[in-house]
Amino acid sequence: MKKLATLIAAALLLATPAHAIVGGGTPQADGVARAVVTIVGSRGNFCTGSLIAPKVVLTVAHCVQPGADYKIVDRGADGTPQLLNVRTVAIHPNFNMQAMQAHRATADVALLQLEIPLKGKSTALVGAPTIPIQVGSRFVIAGIGVTVRGNGKSGGATRVAGLVATGQPGTFQIRLVDPVTNGVRDGIGACTGDSGGPVFEDKPNGPVLVGVISWSTGPNGAAGCGGLTGVTPLTLYRDWILQTARSWGAAL
């Protein structure tokens, strides 16, 4: 009962439409945003996920660790939040929490199986980034996280932002920055609650989900948000995602 009360409190915190992604991400309810969902945990955390099948949500492993209960928050046509039960959580077997916390590459990928289909949403097509990934390649991130670090009430509605690859992007990890600020001063980027959010790349047939948001920093690598956005690309994990989802009966 106590865990359920915590989940309800977290859902109500996110019930009022606000913003997500620091630095001015664009509010969006259509397009890629229609696949975005909110994940709440009984320990009070909240993260972002993507619907990839009517009963399957893709997110990051560090958001859905064992020892807690998780639910999906969905808003009806009148905006009232509802909690949907999660039947099963599958975490990639190669995920390493210490590596993620140190911003090193790891299999930060997980799937949630819902008890019932989530209606009124779109599903995202799962793919992989175009290889080789070039510095300056453009990606679109989406999330329900906070716009003000440390202020949970500033999160809750889906926002999207266009970022570009920096550093040495590859199949293990992609680091994204605001193309205007280049990570050296406050800019657009992921923040608390955006973890697990989808990273899209435009393909000939439309946007494809090619990665998930794992971590963020402030400018110049400082603690915070608005600097780097760390992404786990799905290149090495797409097969595991498809196999796991199909073992649950999902058609991908």
What are these regions (language model features)?
Residues 16-20:
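Sec/Tat signal peptide C-region and signal peptidase I cleavage site
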Residues 7-15:
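Bacterial N-terminal signal peptides
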